[in-house]
Regions:
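ATP-dependent carboxylate activation and anion-phosphoryl transfer catalytic cores
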Residues: 1-167
Length: 167
């Protein structure tokens, strides 16, 4: 319908859902159509450009140039106070050391963005790409776990213990 009216490329639809308190059924209503690039544009374009892939309109699956299904998990708001003070250079070191980057041979891994907000706000964005939805989620979860560990405050168990003997 939108194409017949001249719309091209992407669009986004905003929904509102309300649960009926008596029947517990959800009422889902489309409230707005956005004929512009939306929040999912960046991760999808990242997937498309890195894999040179395409959307299979018959199945709804995204396929790489080698016809391998590809999936992604993305956020533009991985935000934790403990990430504050982490410089983009530090992040690059962690990415390299832990091999968290996108690997062009397997076409899996993570692409980072919004690194300018990392040190001051403890926030960054990332797109994790896998050959299955589960793999994409595992890659994303590993990135978060590695960043959490790298920025964790030492616990009491890790801190040097005071000498229990009086001096």
């Amino acid at each position: 319908v939108l194409a017949a009216k001249g719309a091209i490329e992407r669009y986004g639809v905003d929904f509102i859902t309300v649960q009926d308190p008596h029947t517990k059924r959800w009422d889902i209503q489309a409230i707005e159509i956005n004929l512009r690039k939306g929040g999912t544009t960046h991760p999808f374009m990242t997937l498309r450009l890195l894999t040179n892939g395409r959307l299979d309109y018959d199945t709804g699956n995204f396929l790489s140039q080698q016809n391998q299904e590809k999936y992604y998990i993305a956020t533009d708001n991985l935000h934790k106070a403990q990430y504050q003070g982490l410089l983009p250079n530090d992040l690059m070191d962690i990415i390299a050391q832990e091999r968290l980057h996108f690997d062009s041979s397997s076409m899996t891994g993570t692409v980072f963005h919004l690194m300018g907000a990392l040190s001051e706000f403890g926030k960054l964005g990332l797109t994790s790409i896998g050959n299955s939805l589960a793999e994409a989620q595992e890659i994303y979860d590993r990135v978060e776990a590695v960043l959490d560990k790298a920025t964790a405050n030492p616990t009491d168990a890790d801190a040097p213990q005071a000498n229990p003997l009086p001096l």
